[in-house]
């Protein structure tokens, strides 16, 4: 692969994603990281601002264009830790090198769904047909196959209701894609909800092949307990097909601090908003889990706005942590 595909997904200064940021020194490899690492403007001595006007929001108060800590999955806010980069690259290599099954696991809220969206965004539609399949609890075998077939925009013939018939339709669709020069890439999110029967359906899909190559790649994203479940002997055949695996873990204190700063900058803030000690408190109370960080920081911004606090400090983080 030429270059780093994940780097290409992170917005740069050329698309106005960081409007208002001063020009960086020539030759710096990453102007955004230069800004993150640079000393922040000194905080004002006073920590309280005048009372809010009736129409003012916490975004205006903190000089933000949008909420940096919303729970929606937005690739523009992806902060590239080494751990997330590793997962992305492993899943990408599985696709590009015709590995039939690969898996990323991690605690809830560590960024698995965001990785699925980055893969969906990155994969070349001329070479691949990537589909994200969101698994729901108690989804049946036929329900799973119908979901995949629907994502392929294939109308089911009347009378096709059983697993065998659905698998035949899917296999024919995979062959058609192959003849077009494309490969089906199935990205299964929330795989910890898959039943044993559905796991064996995925194994069957992974067996669609020609003598020269595999014709599908299935990427499984699940909570950490799913990997424990697959250790049971009944899943030996499935587990042995998984050549690529990755594990997402909570962020370190350093990564957590950079994550918060990065998201604030993407949202339009160009100076320090969280005091350094407050960033340490964010990591301590969130455990370094991305979703928990977002919840705590968003609550801190709202609480800080109501208290007219121009910066987020440790006491404010502690108050908000007690509310979670």
Explain the meaning of each model-derived region.
Residues 2-48, 258-261, 265-324:
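C-terminal alpha-helical "lid" subdomain
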Residues 120, 226-241:
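Short regulatory helix/loop adjacent to the ATP-binding pocket of P-loop NTPases
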Residues 171-175, 179-220, 233:
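Conserved Walker B catalytic segment
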Residues 99-118:
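Walker A/P-loop nucleotide-binding motif
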Residues 150-152, 224-225, 233, 254-270:
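Conserved AAA+ ATPase "sensor/coupling" helix adjacent to the nucleotide-binding pocket
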Residues 135-137, 230, 243-255:
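Conserved AAA+ ATPase "SRH/arginine-finger" region at the nucleotide-binding site
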Residues 125-136:
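Conserved catalytic segments around the Walker B and adjacent sensor/switch elements
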Residues 67, 139-158:
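Conserved NTP-binding/hydrolysis module of P-loop NTPases
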């Amino acid at each position: 692969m030429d270059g780093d595909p994940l780097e290409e997904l992170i917005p740069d200064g050329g698309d106005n994603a960081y409007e208002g940021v001063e020009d960086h020194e020539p030759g710096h490899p990453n102007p955004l990281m230069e800004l993150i690492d640079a000393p922040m403007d000194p905080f004002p001595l006073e920590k309280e601002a005048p009372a809010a006007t009736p129409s003012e929001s916490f975004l205006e108060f903190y000089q933000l264009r949008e909420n940096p800590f919303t729970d929606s999955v937005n690739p523009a806010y992806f902060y590239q830790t080494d751990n997330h980069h590793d997962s992305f690259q492993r899943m990408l290599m599985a696709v590009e090198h015709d590995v039939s099954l690969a898996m990323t696991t991690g605690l809830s809220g560590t960024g698995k769904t965001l990785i699925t969206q980055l893969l969906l965004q990155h994969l070349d539609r001329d070479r691949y047909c990537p589909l994200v399949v969101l698994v729901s609890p108690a989804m049946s075998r036929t329900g799973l196959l119908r979901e995949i077939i629907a994502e392929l925009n294939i109308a089911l013939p009347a009378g096709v209701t059983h697993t065998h018939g659905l698998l035949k339709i899917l296999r024919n669709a995979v062959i058609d894609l192959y003849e077009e020069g494309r490969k089906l890439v199935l990205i299964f999110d929330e795989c910890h909800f898959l039943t044993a029967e559905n796991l064996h359906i995925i194994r069957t899909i992974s067996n669609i092949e020609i003598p020269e190559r595999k014709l599908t790649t299935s990427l499984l994203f699940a909570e950490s307990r799913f990997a424990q479940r697959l250790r049971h002997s009944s899943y030996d055949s499935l587990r042995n097909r998984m050549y690529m695996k990755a594990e997402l873990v909570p962020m370190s204190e350093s990564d957590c601090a950079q994550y918060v700063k990065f998201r604030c900058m993407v949202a339009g803030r160009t100076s320090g908003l969280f005091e350094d000690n407050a960033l340490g408190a964010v990591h301590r109370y969130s455990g370094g889990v991305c979703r928990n960080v977002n919840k705590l920081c968003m609550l801190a911004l709202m609480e800080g706005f109501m208290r007219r606090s121009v910066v987020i400090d440790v006491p404010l983080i502690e108050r908000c942590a007690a509310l979670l």
